[in-house]
């Protein structure tokens, strides 16, 4: 077994740190909506990313919301929100260039999560000819379809369940 695969002893500083992190996560999920969502669906799931994009702390009480605020302010989640802004800017720039050349705009995202970052990037006054969102998770597809309906974009945006590695 390599050193990377050997469990850390809880009696070492690193082992104690990670053991405490696991305990705090298990405890925090009882109060913090974001931590619970991460534990339930995975911290890299589309549901968790959508929650992080919204950046609104929620919890069972003020203590839970404080935990959630701390969780949402983590440097990694701040980076994810910046990535969303960068993707939105890239979509808007590409759309502008295509429009200037008189070409149609079609957007495809093959691993959309809930699709919020694409939907947020769409300019209502100049919607693309089509937007096609895909994700493998039925939970993400249902949430994405609800966002599309909420924004009245059914005529332009579609969301289908499909694996990014399938054709």
Model-derived features: positions:
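Conserved Class I S-adenosyl-L-methionine-dependent methyltransferase catalytic core
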Residues: 5-99
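Conserved SAM-binding strand-loop segment of SAM-dependent methyltransferases
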Residues: 152-164
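Conserved class I S-adenosyl-L-methionine
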Residues: 102-113
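Conserved SAM-binding loop
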Residues: 144-145
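Conserved SAM-binding loop of SAM-dependent methyltransferases across substrates and taxa
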Residues: 114-127
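Conserved SAM/SAH-binding beta-strand->alpha-helix loop
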Residues: 137-139
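Short helix-capping segments at alpha-helix termini
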Residues: 124-127, 149-154
